[in-house]
């Protein structure tokens, strides 16, 4: 695998091949690689254009708008992605509305304030995973651990670093990077600096068994349609 990618599509395609070729079969129906870090040089190129992935920008925008609302209820978002209906205990309330997480204790606002007051700060971080709440994670354990910002010295661009405990490449990463880089752009605009590099670290980066032949199935269908 590479470490630096031009855009999200290049990252997705290379990582898909790397996991399928070098990943380890797990006991939970995935192939996984561990402690993977890479970066995307042009995070504003966040739309996955790989034909067989069939990325939905419309859904990604809905998910980001849901995060921005800070509403923990999945009553509406689950209409577009049924997986959300499996992540609550019957009350439609989840922990993985990241906007709810970053507004608690004004975490994101404090990051922006710190960067405005001191562009060299190393403290502009907010956390998503909260160890004090692990007993509440029965149905929905947040995949993202923390998010940090840096204004790169000399270049004066805003970098973002996202750390994740677990990351499904096909759906998780594709939508996650879309939403996180949208937030990166919003923060950069608030600070009056250009968007910089997006850094992504995943402890467990994986592909589910049902997606092992995703690429092959797509091209077989294309041949049938000729």
Task: Give, region by region, the residue ranges found by the protein language model.
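Terminal, non-catalytic protein-protein interaction segments that mediate quaternary/complex assembly
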Residues: 1-226
